[in-house]
UniProtKB/Swiss-Prot annotation:
Segment forming the signal sequence: none
Function according to Swiss-Prot or TrEMBL: The monopolin-like pcs1/mde4 complex is essential for accurate chromosome segregation during mitosis and meiosis II. May clamp together microtubule binding sites on the same kinetochore, preventing merotelic attachment of microtubules. In contrast to its S.cerevisiae ortholog CSM1, is not required ofr mono-orientation during meiosis I.
Keywords per UniProt: Cell cycle, Cell division, Centromere, Chromosome, Coiled coil, Meiosis, Mitosis, Nucleus
Skewed-composition ranges (Basic and acidic residues): 10-19
Location of the protein in the cell: Nucleus, Nucleolus; Chromosome, Centromere
Keyword Cell cycle recorded: yes
Name of the molecule in the record: Monopolin complex subunit pcs1
Biased composition (Basic residues): 21-34
Region described as Disordered: spans on this chain: 1-42
Assembly and oligomerization: Component of a monopolin-like complex composed of pcs1 and mde4. The complex associates with the kinetochore.
GO biological process: attachment of mitotic spindle microtubules to kinetochore; cell division; meiotic sister chromatid segregation; mitotic chromosome centromere condensation; mitotic sister chromatid segregation
Length: 261
């Protein structure tokens, strides 16, 4: 009997201990929930802060985009040569014109690089130190090109004046001698002038090839359209002939006489 009572007492103690542990566990649960809720509040606040930072970044990007767009219009401001008919230029003038054109293209390329380098600064400065020497060299070269720009403009003005003068000279030659030079082509044989002379009998089109010593005359006659003219021309003007530079004035006089008589 005593053993049974002792066993019952122990069972009661164990039950009381179990109840105490359960009560402690129940009291702990709300605190754990409270801590979870506070963690969620911290996460929510972090989310709001991140949203504000993202909005600020968007505003920064928009400002950078505005700066870049305003600068891009500068890329369209480039030096340009005046429109010139190359056929009106002599061989030397055409070479000078092409050299000026190359120089202007180089200036425009350097200016474009300079502008793009400036526009890239608001976007990122990564690697700027590594390229600093190259940029400085290019800026120095650009400054030198700008200094030469003034003399380049003067050369362009002179070229335009020369073109006007040559046009006036061609008008004078046409009025006095009836000679027009359409163009000049340089090849391995020399200079080929495409010409035409006009007189009372009509207009004769021909090509003159000038090499180091001689002229080569090649008429360009059409049997159908130039039939009447061919009747009045001497035979030597109906075929290819070669004569020296010294004989050039004599040939010109005979050609004009044949077209007038």
């Amino acid at each position: 009997m005593r053993k049974n009572n002792m066993q019952t007492s122990k069972d009661s103690e164990l039950k009381e201990q179990a109840k105490g542990k359960s009560s402690k566990l129940i009291h702990k649960l709300p605190k754990q929930r409270t801590r979870i809720s506070q963690g969620q509040m911290h996460s929510t606040q972090d989310f709001v802060n991140n949203e504000d930072q993202d909005a600020y970044s968007v505003r920064e990007n928009e400002n950078e985009l505005h700066i870049n767009n305003s600068g891009m219009s500068e890329l369209n401001k480039k030096l340009q040569l005046p429109n010139v008919e190359l056929s009106t230029l002599s061989h030397t003038q055409e070479q000078e014109f092409n050299e000026l054109n190359k120089l202007i293209r180089k200036i425009n390329e350097l200016q474009e690089f300079y502008l793009l380098e400036d526009l890239a600064k608001p976007v990122t400065n990564a690697g700027a130190d590594a390229d600093d020497t190259i940029v400085k060299d290019l800026k120095k070269e650009l400054e030198n090109e700008k200094k030469a720009n003034h003399s380049l403009k003067n050369e362009l003005l002179k070229t335009r004046e020369q073109i006007k003068n040559y046009s006036k000279i061609n008008i004078l030659i046409k009025e006095l001698f009836g000679l027009e030079v359409a163009d000049c082509i340089e090849d391995e044989d020399g200079y080929r002038f495409n010409c035409k002379n006009t007189g009372r009998r009509g207009t004769l089109e021909y090509q003159l090839l000038l090499d180091d010593q001689n002229f080569t005359f090649t008429p360009r006659l059409n049997v159908q359209t130039d039939e009447e003219l061919m009747k009045h021309l001497p035979d030597y003007l109906l075929e290819e002939i070669i004569f020296t530079k010294e004989q050039g004035k004599l040939f010109s006089a005979r050609l004009m006489k044949a077209l007038q008589d």
